[in-house]
Amino acid sequence: MTTVLRRFTDHKDAGEPYKLEQDHLAARLGTSLFRDGRLRSAKFADKAVLVSGHNNRKIGAVIQKGKWKGYPVFTLTLEERATCPRSCLHWLDCYGNKMNWPTRWMADDDLIPTIGRNLSDLAREIPNFVIRLHVLGDFYSVAYVRQWAAWLDEFSGLHIYGYTAWQPGTAIGDSISTLARDRWDRFAVRTSNGAA
């Protein structure tokens, strides 16, 4: 008997990306297409903002290979475009344009304390775990990057992987690159369309 590690086992061709026009309101304002009912402040989180990768067809519940094999995966989804650099190559054709179901968490004053509580809960229950940053969205400030560095110090079982559109040479990009260089064993975040 095999164990299914994904909630969704059928993979369908995603087709062509849905590309916004330059003058589309979401492109101009830097927001998600799905703000109504899908964008929430963490202060209203009735459940965790870090959710099992089991709910994502591309990620799955547990790491299957490598040094983190066997570690459960949790994901964080922020609002695309609102947290991303306008220089992102996928500003208009972000795959979030076709993702109407995920809840996007606002980068507001309640997000960091809520993530901290979620991490504390996970650390009490699970010796080693992985956070996939970010299914949608990106690092939105240097302070936010530094907070992840502090959480790495606080929670020895925390491991992080993901991608960022923030390029080296920007304040946020340099913060991410430095953290990845110094803590690659637990902070494996790569720069999209560029070197790690």
Regions found by a protein language model. Name each.
Residues 1-196:
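Class I S-adenosyl-L-methionine
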